[in-house]
């Protein structure tokens, strides 16, 4: 084997080792993050989270309207996870594409963090619940510590008529002229769970964290331009 090929082989091997080391370090970091929660669980240092979702009354003297079917997920607090969520919200108004894709981006960030917890042997720390017809939800047996609550509710389906340019309408007769979507309302809160105590969280239209559409149907994405053929 020539010296140059030996050098390339060594570089590839080093790059592989670095990548593996980085991946293991990431898992170790997450394992360190969840260790206090697992210790609290083993010591039965547990608390409860009680959530209440509602809409404020539109007129004085009326009762709040309970919000059923609000999904909740409680995850061990992570500054990195929180920063990833903030990044999605910060880019919400950058473009129409960012606005439409925000819900998918939030879900991707959440799922990635949940997978990381499972990989670190802490899948039991991913806690899910939903509010009932009274707008109430309770999560019991939470290890003491800081948690990040992410909650969301999907609204009714809406439609919007689209303007299609004449040339496109003639060329593509099957272009949809209506976009259907639903609005997703998010709440986010950092909560501290203490042993033997119940922490209460209110989810109302006054403390919404983010609102974005989930597109369900509409115009197809434009095809990617084909790269020019290389001349031989």
Q: Model-derived features: where do they sit?
A:
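Bacterial N-terminal signal peptides that target proteins for export
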Residues: 1-11
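Bacterial N-terminal signal peptides
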Residues: 11-19
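Primarily secretory-pathway and cell-envelope proteins
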Residues: 25-112, 153-232
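Extracytoplasmic
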Residues: 116
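Short, small/polar residue-rich loop motifs at catalytic or cofactor-binding pockets
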Residues: 123-125
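Short beta-strand segments within Ig-like beta-sandwich modules, predominantly Fibronectin type-III
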Residues: 128-131
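Short, surface-exposed beta-strand/beta-hairpin micro-motifs centered on an aromatic residue
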Residues: 133-141
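A short tyrosine-centered beta-strand micro-motif
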Residues: 145-151
């Amino acid at each position: 084997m020539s010296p140059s090929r030996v050098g390339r082989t060594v570089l590839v091997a080093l790059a592989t080792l670095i990548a593996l080391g980085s991946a293991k370090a990431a898992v170790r970091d997450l394992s360190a993050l969840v260790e206090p929660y697992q210790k609290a669980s083993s010591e039965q240092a547990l608390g409860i989270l009680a959530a209440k979702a509602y809409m404020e009354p539109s007129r004085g003297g009326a009762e709040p309207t309970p919000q059923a079917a609000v999904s909740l997920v409680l995850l061990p607090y992570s500054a990195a996870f929180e920063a990833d969520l903030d990044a999605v919200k910060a880019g919400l108004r950058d473009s129409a594409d960012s606005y439409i894709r925000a819900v998918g981006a939030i879900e991707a960030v959440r799922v990635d963090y949940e997978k990381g917890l499972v990989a670190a042997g802490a899948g039991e720390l991913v806690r899910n619940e939903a509010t009932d017809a009274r707008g109430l939800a309770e999560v019991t047996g939470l290890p003491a510590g800081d948690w990040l609550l992410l909650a969301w509710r999907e609204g009714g389906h809406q439609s919007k008529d689209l303007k299609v340019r004449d040339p496109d309408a003639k060329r593509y007769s099957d272009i949809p002229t209506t976009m259907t979507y639903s609005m997703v309302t998010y709440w986010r809160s950092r909560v501290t769970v203490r042993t033997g105590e119940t922490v209460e969280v209110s989810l109302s239209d006054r403390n919404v964290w983010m609102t974005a559409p989930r597109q369900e149907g509409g115009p197809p994405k434009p095809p990617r331009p084909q790269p020019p053929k290389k001349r031989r």
